């Protein structure tokens, strides 16, 4: 880090740059903004970060982020128990929920199969998904996974495991190849869900 920054400011900028989507210039702007804020604001921010880290874990059913053992979606009697939407990350749950078009349950895999990065099926929440999907009330599993190489690998792998005992569909590709669900606008996501289709097996 350049000597134009004092050491504490340089450390702050370095830490901010470690956040996703934050480059050097954005990190600098954020750091300069933060040090101008009242100390009470900074303490409140630090406290919120600590509390979120300490109190937010994973739902024991679907593995979505939750401050309780079972998340609000899984615990809600208003949600449709006949459908499970499978996503890679909690960000995808949030993106789909914003559409207000899906009323079933979710299952968060916790990533995508990526041999190059050493991520195998055993690293993901696939076995709990199979157990949930094999329950008699489940009629459909929707695979809402990003259309990347890793996403396609994961979709086909999970779909093959599920197809013997439940209907498996995937969202329509109104999404760009390699695009993340959480970057798609709500209308595009809603259409992708509405236009879902069964996977064509080779």
From Swiss-Prot:
Start and end residues of each Toprim domain: 82-176
Keyword Cytoplasm: no
Annotated S-S bridges: none
Keyword DNA damage: yes
Pfam families: RecR_C (PF21175), RecR_HhH (PF21176), RecR_ZnF (PF02132), Toprim_4 (PF13662)
Zinc finger (C4-type): 59-74
Keywords: DNA damage, DNA recombination, DNA repair, Metal-binding, Zinc, Zinc-finger
SUPFAM superfamilies, per the entry: Recombination protein RecR
GO biological process: DNA recombination; DNA repair
MF-aspect GO terms: DNA binding; zinc ion binding
Function: May play a role in DNA repair. It seems to be involved in an RecBC-independent recombinational process of DNA repair. It may act with RecF and RecO.
Family: Belongs to the RecR family.
Protein name per the record: Recombination protein RecR
Organism: Thermosynechococcus vestitus (strain NIES-2133 / IAM M-273 / BP-1)
Gene designation per UniProt: recR
